[in-house]
Amino acid sequence: ALPGPLPFILSRTYSSYRTKTPAPVGIFGPGWKAPSDIRLQIRDDALVLNDNGGRSIHFEPLLPGEAVYSRSESLWLVRGGKATQPDGHTLARLWASLPPDIRLSPHLYLATNSAQGPWWILGWSELVPGAEDVLPAPLPPYRVLTGLADRFGRTLTYRREAAGDLAGEITGVTDGAGREFRLVLTTQAQRAEEARKQRTASLSSPDTPRPLSASAFPDTLPGTEYGPDRGIRLSAVWLMHDPAYPESLPGAPLARYTYTEAGELLAVYDRSNTQVRAFSYDAQHPGRMVAHRYAGRPEMRYRYDDTGRVVEQLNPAGLSYRYLYEQDRITVTDSLNRREVLHTEGGAGLKRVVKKELADGSVTRSGYDAAGRLTAQTDAAGRRTEYGLNVVSGDITDITTPDGRETKFYYNDGNQLTAVVSPDGLESRREYDEPGRLVSETSRSGETVRYRYDDAHS
């Protein structure tokens, strides 16, 4: 990401885990997920938010302006169509910061995991209608990520293709600083054609490194266990416009990506065209990563069992680990033969480690509430620390240490910490302005530090 207000952050995560309802394969290939992959299904009896990890979070249908909160996911979902939220509502300030055309539209949905933002704006992409489509076309029964909005009213916008092979895919982004980025996407057929051209060039020039065999690069992708795959991949990200430096645009992409013949992410290059990451996959299980490497570091390798779980992590320059899976317990043994046992309770997204047997024979325990939030910890000496939580937000309201001493925490309507009262009765305080920025801190000794902001939108 380039620094600035509400910057465009292009991130990716990998998981070999496959849910029962896997999400469609995204622009980085099977197993890889990007934050922009989220989608909201709009049904008559429910709203279903599908995140980039294949999870399905269910909500009740919402009326215009109505909000709902998921305690287990710490996530708010709000439907547009209302100018204000009620006084004292956790999201009242954040809602008021939205541009009117966003918060007043009943066709938009907004999600956030913090009362300080940002909002994820869930809308729809404009598509070119077909010759047989009825006009005006009805809105689709789903919403996709179309942008972000922060608490200062700044927005980041995703531009999606309206027609062709890339219809619905993000190909452009404008961030909060007005910078414009172009995302270069390719199809499997285009990558196969490029492989054929490289092979032809290498045959005509014996000094050219030999590329992947064109015969091994099919025009269509093999099926995987990671969900439907259109074969569209991100190949490069370019900075196209920067209002601060309009004449100093880079002559190379900010990042570049290459892929295997199976559409798996193979390598990542930075703006100097230096390879910074490399990945390898199981030929029998497309998308299952078996090795990865950072530039200048040794390669980390993984072995899996028949169910697709990692059973060994091999590090040639450090500790390696073996994993044994049993009912409600996982045994981890390192290359020095030290063993740790993790005992779990709960299922699916609420599975938690409740007991750890450490290599030295000591045991620690943890307790959780019904939403999977930490409520207690017991150390190896049997000393127990308890955490009181706000039932709705999950914020810590008090901590009781093993000696019975209690520390209390207080928050404002936006879930921002305003005061901490220590066991000795001394108090520290924080104050915020209307947009939620910290303006003063008062220590336990009564000393106050004040903060001033030159820019009302900083």
What kind of feature is each model-predicted range?
Residues 1-2, 20:
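Eukaryotic proteins' extreme N-terminal regulatory segments
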Residues 2-13:
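Predominantly extracellular/luminal regions of secreted and cell-surface proteins
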Residues 10, 30, 45-458:
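Extended charged/polar low-complexity repeat regions
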Residues 15-17:
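Acidic glycine-/aspartate-rich tracts in secreted/extracellular proteins
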Residues 20-31:
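Short, polar loop/linker segments at the starts of domains and inter-domain junctions
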Residues 32-36:
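A cross-family detector of function-defining hotspots
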